[in-house]
Amino acid sequence: MNFAMALDYQSCINCKACEVACKEENGVQLGADKQRIWVGQTEETIFGKPFVNFYPSQCNHCLDAPCVDVCPTNASHFTVGGLVMVDKEKCILCKGCMEACPYDARFVDDKKVAVDKCTFCYDTRILNGETTTACQATCPTKVRLFGDLDDENGELVQLLKSRKFFVLKEDEGTVPKLFYLVPEQDENFAIRSIGHNTKIYTWDEFKPIIEKAKAKRSPQWKSM
């Protein structure tokens, strides 16, 4: 198993339903700065009128995760399916992982007295055999699709085979597993929507990157 998520981000309406569902599902601490998932935005002008692009984000569960490398206590670690997790009992709040994460996907949970982040609903859903996350299940415009990259016949891989996509900050070399689907009619939309140049991938181009990183890191993955 190698869990990941595709996002048809052009369909995001910034309704915040995913953020609310995540907090309720996972008991995330209240507060605007306490988010496992969030919706970012960029602005542009189209035909002389202002236009806002929304792009949902969260922990990318990188296959070459720098947060895991810098953690002195192994609190940040890989678990089943290549998920990056935080063991709150081992976390000493050094915040090294927060500084190492290029996606700003971590925050301090004052109740747990530990760093917190998205887990793809590992404790509440994956361990119970469920195949969707809370954010996917609640999204009214079907932005997210969670799945297993090792399942060639699964819905996620089939979608990635049919659509081009990009990942955030690919130059960091983290091999992230959030895939942002490019609008079929306009590849330049991706560049405009995030405000900088980015490489557009096909699944055949990105799959070898995934496989190389998995071969390197999978010995660290814990079993369910």
Where are these regions (language model features)?
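Non-ligating segments of multi-cofactor redox enzymes
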Residues: M1-M224
